[in-house]
């Protein structure tokens, strides 16, 4: 039987976090944060099954590179306590194979976030073969129609 678990967090400078570091961790990669000059290296981390960046059509193509996407977010958010990203950790059903879990996540992320103008970066981890889960990192602000960030943003209206 599938076990449900979902955890939601905010990545903010006020809590000492970085969107670049969060993305590097979940993608088991090395990324340089232009904002603070720190290199984040998680290339020795194990268990990465799949990773993908999903963008709305108005997003710049270079944001398909997660390092450029999250550095753009870090540059746009100016204050020392800025909210940089929303992060979800979601358990995936062990009953589904890898391709089914990927498809499930892509559909969920597209319908709930990307179609509303948000950029999404996700990775599937399963270190021991018994705990498949996904890390989803989302931009806090959806993009405007012209591919720029809004000056301020207060709420997200969910589709009915």
Each language-model region and where it sits:
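N-terminal nicking endonuclease/strand-transfer module with a His-rich metal-binding environment
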Residues: 1-156
């Amino acid at each position: 039987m599938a076990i449900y678990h979902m955890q939601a967090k905010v990545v903010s400078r006020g809590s000492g976090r970085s969107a670049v570091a969060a993305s590097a961790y979940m993608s088991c990669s090395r990324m340089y944060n232009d904002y603070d000059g720190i290199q984040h290296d998680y290339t020795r981390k194990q268990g990465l099954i799949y990773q993908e960046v999903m963008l709305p059509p108005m997003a710049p193509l270079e944001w398909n590179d997660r390092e450029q996407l999250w550095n753009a977010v870090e540059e746009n958010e100016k204050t020392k306590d800025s909210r940089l990203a929303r992060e979800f950790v979601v358990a995936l059903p062990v009953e589904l194979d890898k391709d089914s879990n990927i498809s499930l996540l892509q559909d969920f992320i597209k319908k709930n976030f990307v179609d509303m103008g948000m950029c999404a970066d996700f990775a599937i981890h399963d270190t021991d073969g018994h705990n498949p889960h996904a890390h989803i990192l989302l931009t806090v602000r959806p993009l405007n129609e012209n591919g720029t960030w809004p000056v301020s943003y207060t709420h997200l209206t969910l589709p009915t």
